[in-house]
Amino acid sequence: MTVFIGIYKAIYNYEPQTPDELTIQEDDLLYLLEKSNVDDWWTVKKRVIGSDIDEPAGLVPSNYVEVADVISQVKAVYDYHEVQNPDEELVFNENDTFDVYDDKDPDWILARSISTNQFGFIPGNYVEPLNAETGSAVPPSQPAAAAALPPPIATSATSPPAPALTAIDISTLPPPPQHSSKTNAQASDSGNRDYADKDLPDLPPNKPSRSNTETNEDDYYDAPPTKPARPNSTSNEQDTRQKARSRTSYYDQHYEDDAEDYRSSQRDDDYNDSEPSGELRTWNVAEIEGRKKRKAKLSIGNNRLFFSPQKGSPQDWSVDKLISYDNEKKHLFLEFVDPYKSLELHTGDNDTCKEILSVIGEIKGASRDPGFKEVEMASKSKKKGNVLYDFTAESNDELTIKQGQVVYIINDQKSKDWWLCELIDSGKRGVVPSHFIEPIQEKLTSSHTGGLFKSIKKFAKGGKSSKASDDAYSGSWEDDGMEGSTERRSRSGSYSTRKRASSTTSKKELPNPKKSRIWEDRSGTFKVEAQFIGCKEGKVHLHKANGVKIAVAAEKLSDDDLVYVERVTGFSLDKYKVRGSGTSSSRQDPRESERERRRRLRENDEKDRDRRLRERELNELQKARQLLDNERTKLQEQNEQPPSKPPRPSSGMGNRSRSQSTKDNYDWFEFFLNSGVDVSSCQRYTSNFEKERITEDMMVDINDSILRTLGLREGDIVRVMKYLDKKLGRDVSPQTAVVAGGMFSEADGSLKNNNSENQSSVGQQLLPNNPDLVSNTPIDDDTWTVRPAAKSEATLAPKTAEFTGSMQDLLDLKPLEPKKTEQLPIANLAVTESVVPEPNLKNLEPVRTGNVVQKPLANTLTGGATLVPLDPFKTGGNNVLPVTTGFVMMPFATGGAMPIQRTGGIIVPQTTFGTNAAGGIMPAQITGGLIPVATTGGLMPQTSFGVTPVANVVPLQRTGGAVMPIATTGGANILPQTTFNLPPSGTVLPIQRTANGLMAANTTGGMMPLNTTGGMMPLNTTGGMIPLNTTGGMMPMNTTGGVMSLQRTGGMMPQTSFGTQQMTGGAMNMMPQISFGAQQMTGGAMNVFPQTSFGAQQMTGGAMQNPNMGTMQNPNMGVMQNPNMGAFQPKSQFGMTLQRTGGAMAQPIMDAGVTGIAQGVQNMSMAQPLQNQPTGFGFGNGPQQPVQANIYNASASNPFGF
């Protein structure tokens, strides 16, 4: 259902007297929105053609309008149910008929539905005109339409004057409201309320009486609760109407920026100089276009200028859009932009033109200067609030505020969570959270601007009713007339609802201090400060400083006050002035009064000019003060930065400037480029140097450690240090670097010697004296591992201090002195040291392969319980271990089970099958001297013919003795396993020569050999794959009577690493352990067998793995430990068996009937010397190599001393 009650047209022109009234012209189409039940003022909206033009709404006298004529009829051809704006559009079905009132807009036709009797708009393309028969019935439809609207017809019937009133004197009638010369307040002042219902036939009717009490715009639409939102809810109407057409109310365009403020403060009076909330000011002007003048209105308020022409759409601009303003007498010239408009207005008199210019100058200056704005706001009674917390705006409609600020609360009713506030200094508006603002009580802001508003406190607390406000008319003047009070009371009683709302609003209103003046009665007894409102019916209406409005009889005022009223209104009040008693004086009174009036006008003008000058000076002072305050505030903000804020841009600029200055001091990128560093690394190094703020003067202190800390790579460190030495001119001559070595290495990469100081040095007689061989020997520095820098030994000569970091250095150093259980006598040490033989230089051609001078290892006794250390050796690939080629007595066990030794033939050394050799030459066992041959009772040992050995060259070992003793191992004698005619695979294996031609060889491939001795002989798994203990399958079986200790033979033997020294004598009988640098004991009191971790198979059958079960594996008991378990067992030059820790582990042979002669020590020096053996790559039956091995010349790069 639409909001239109009817369609009317204006029959007279009407000029509004108050802002809530509507300007209408004759024949204007009007939509009736509401009829008043208490007076004859109706709320209508004017029909305006065009989608972009707003349709104004307001009040008009009911006797100025009549029902519009129906111009045609149409019929619906489609159903129309989906309306876009139900407040203005009609819902209809097909074949419905309509009365058309206006079809000037082809898209939307203004019509009335005959079926539902509703008024509104229908789409033009949904209807079609009726046929001729229907069209002929159009004129009679007008009475039908009038009959359908009884209230408008009844009203119009009562409005026309009776014919009997034609005899009334025309001079007594008030002028018509549309008179052009009566645009000011006197047009309504002279209107007699007694003639509201009477009029002459040839004159337009008077507008109905209206109340003097303020009428709020909301009052006209709050009465009927069932109706939709009225034009006071401009935003709601605008939102709904703009969906279909841009038809909004008249006041939406004028006050859309401050509608709430205007509605809460506008007053209902009949004078053009009334100012709602002391802010909006309106003047009736005439727009001049060429030679034509058109009536218009100019309104200024809320920092906006509103121009409403009589014909045409109203326009408004903000103050900043006004680019120029000037006047020439009564003509006012304004020029706007966005949109551009140049106006020439005629104000009617010079005073009005000056007043308009003054107001424009004030708001223009206020928009440019916040200080003036603050002064202007101080003269208003706006609700203020204190800001409790800081709030930063995150959207365009929000307002940024700081704690401690005072803001104006513009609207706190629309939303309880968000309030519309305005900054006092800048005038910027926006919404802020309501809980961020604490409203200030009215009493705190009611006494500003001196003593002008002293009485507002009492007025604000009074809570007076409208009746008390009416009684105040006689508060300051004894004889104030109250003509028309009966009529006022009757009107106030007829619409008490609106009066209550108006009285509530009036309590908050105060007069404009700029228009307030001192009024004095004729006797000089009473004075009051008030603002002139208007003059009507011989009464002067004033607005006192306390907010009370009074009406004073004109004859009670002084002549000065009457002259002021005449100047403002333009009416003559001479009849109310004091006149002389004489006839001559009475004839001269008009001239004298005119002179007096002009004199007073001049005085008033001068006073006003002086007042404006003072106000301008005050504004300039406050502007300067505000500027100083702003500068002071900025300085304080810069000096007192809150700690929670991020660093100021000045700090960031300082950091960048310092960083830039550092960059400017020295170009590290160029430095690294000149040093030879790769370009991809120069930037990273440069960034690291700049982060650490390394400057050019710090180059002298840069060393390897600093560069390494700064992230430089090793190669780049060398380049940078060389460049620094060259740049700084430092001495780069070779010097012995005094640097600390590693934990186990020296400065040149060799292993440290941790033996005691009493170790003897290598005898000079054992060193080669051929300088050519030494000098021509190539040196390969990359043979072994990387050599870290370390501190060199002070005891070594510079010639012998160059180590290569190889495993050979272990043989060149003294072994650690173990913790001995018995102290060996010095005499015995001397005896053993004297046993060292001289090398046979005939068969040996020593070759120096390095600059390292070997120190002889100390000999240890093999008898008793003395712990004998085992020389360390490297257990990886590329192991070239020296062997003794001299005459060395080999100890052997005479009782119990003896381990199987290689004794001759084309001997394939035992290789570490199952383990990956890292390459190089595998050292061979020393088999010289008296090598015991195990008699196996006639059983031939299993040979390893056709078994492929490890793909490395194993040097041929030649045994020196002529007679090889045969060791009886209890029971049957077992012949050693031989490898005669074994085809080597992958490399050339040296052949061991034996003295007696009978060498036992261990099988290195095929099935595992079975020891069939009567004693306890272990099954040695020397084959290619990992040996398996035959505990039911192919596991070695102990055929001895005692309990045999099952050894772990599967997997890999634990590999020893650098610095490992193995003890093979003494009470300890430990197998070597795995970790690097550990000192391993292979003999001793504890028979701890190390556990291997690479593919080992644990013996789970037979006896326990503990060697101590059954028979102790103590070397004192004559039990020999077989070192030849799948790996080649090297021999040391001091007669001790070097235990190979790779491959399968050996099983100790246990026998209860052994003697403790041998002590488990192999290769002890015996009476028979060992012969030098060929160490080349040929076999034993081939020609001798020209170069022979010399263990005393062995080094890291030449382990055999070629």
Curated annotation (Swiss-Prot):
Region named Disordered: 133-278, 462-518, 577-609, 622-661, 749-770
Domain called SH3: residue spans: 3-70, 71-132, 380-442
Gene3D superfamilies referenced in this protein's UniProt entry, alphabetically: SH3 Domains (2.30.30.40), SLA1 homology domain 1 (2.30.30.700), Transcription Factor, Ets-1 (1.10.150.50)
Superkingdom to which the source organism belongs: Eukaryota
Gene encoding the protein: SLA1
Entry keyword set: Actin-binding, Cell membrane, Cytoplasm, Cytoskeleton, Endocytosis, Endosome, Membrane, Repeat, SH3 domain
Organism whose genome encodes this protein: Vanderwaltozyma polyspora (strain ATCC 22028 / DSM 70294 / BCRC 21397 / CBS 2163 / NBRC 10782 / NRRL Y-8283 / UCD 57-17) (Kluyveromyces polysporus)
Compositional bias segments (type: Low complexity): 136-167
PROSITE patterns on file: SH3
A Pfam family matched in the record: SH3_1
Function recorded in the entry: Component of the PAN1 actin cytoskeleton-regulatory complex required for the internalization of endosomes during actin-coupled endocytosis. The complex links the site of endocytosis to the cell membrane-associated actin cytoskeleton. Mediates uptake of external molecules and vacuolar degradation of plasma membrane proteins. Plays a role in the proper organization of the cell membrane-associated actin cytoskeleton and promotes its destabilization.
Topology with respect to the bilayer: Peripheral membrane protein
PANTHER family: ACTIN CYTOSKELETON-REGULATORY COMPLEX PROTEIN SLA1 (PTHR15735:SF19), FCH AND DOUBLE SH3 DOMAINS PROTEIN (PTHR15735)
Biased composition (Polar residues): 179-190, 652-661, 751-770
Quaternary structure annotation from Swiss-Prot or TrEMBL: Component of the PAN1 actin cytoskeleton-regulatory complex.
GO biological process, any: endocytosis
Alphabetical list of InterPro entries matching this protein: PH_SLA1, SAM/pointed_sf, SH3-like_dom_sf, SH3_domain, SHD1, Sla1_SH3_1, Sla1_SH3_3
GO molecular function: actin binding; cargo adaptor activity; identical protein binding; ubiquitin binding
Taxonomic classification: Eukaryota, Fungi, Dikarya, Ascomycota, Saccharomycotina
Subcellular location: Cell membrane; Endosome membrane; Cytoplasm, Cytoskeleton, Actin patch
Principal location class: membrane
Name the UniProt record assigns to this protein: Actin cytoskeleton-regulatory complex protein SLA1
Family: Belongs to the SLA1 family.
Compositional bias ranges of the Basic and acidic residues kind: 191-201, 253-269, 506-518, 588-609, 622-637
